[in-house]
Amino acid sequence: MTVIKSSINASKIMKYTGELPQKQLADLLLTSRPNVSHIQTGRRKMQQDIAITALNNVQSNLFKLALSHEFTELVPDVFSGKYVNQNPLSFLVMYEQEANEFSANIDAVMKILVKPASQLTTNERVSARNNLKELIDVLGWGYNLLFFASDYLNIDAYQLISEQDESWKQKKWI
């Protein structure tokens, strides 16, 4: 079941705020410095109202991605594992690799999607599920590429997405 959480342990994602002092973070989050300290250590959960303020006031795109993931899990988390090279070109290469893997199976996906869902065999459903997981990999790397490159280039990812929303509305896609 998909849920928007009322609060989260934000200690992991607070690292994406950079080297901002707690006092400055408190001002950005419209809360007290001790509350920021407790959120950073995991002693206190970050509430939705503080998260909303953080999304509006903290400049780090990676922070916004990680925060959005923690509250909804409908967007991917920041790919920051030990086997991920934190370089925009590495994100681009991984995105391309995953996109090519998905693209290689596009014919199989089409054969499944042209059939009514009620007529799919068990094997076709398993194949569809696996191909959708490949698509999730592509989207995960795509989101991470967008947010990492936006931070690298000092561009607001939210603004880019908002601009695309307008473009999609004009095209009558949404």
Residue ranges and their predicted role:
Residues 1-17:
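A short, Lys/Arg-rich alpha-helix, primarily the initiator
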Residues 14-15, 26, 55:
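The alpha-helix within a helix-turn-helix
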Residues 30-45:
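Recognition helix of helix-turn-helix/homeodomain-like DNA-binding domains
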Residues 72-140:
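Helix-turn-helix/homeodomain-like alpha-helical modules used for DNA recognition
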Residues 8, 19-21, 46-49:
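Residue-level signal for the short linker/turn that defines the boundary of a DNA-recognition helix
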Residues 112-174:
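Charged, low-complexity intrinsically disordered regulatory/assembly segments
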Residues 49-65:
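DNA major-groove recognition helix of helix-turn-helix/homeodomain DNA-binding modules
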Residues 10-11, 25-26, 36-39:
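Conserved hydrophobic/aromatic packing and binding residues within compact polymer-binding modules
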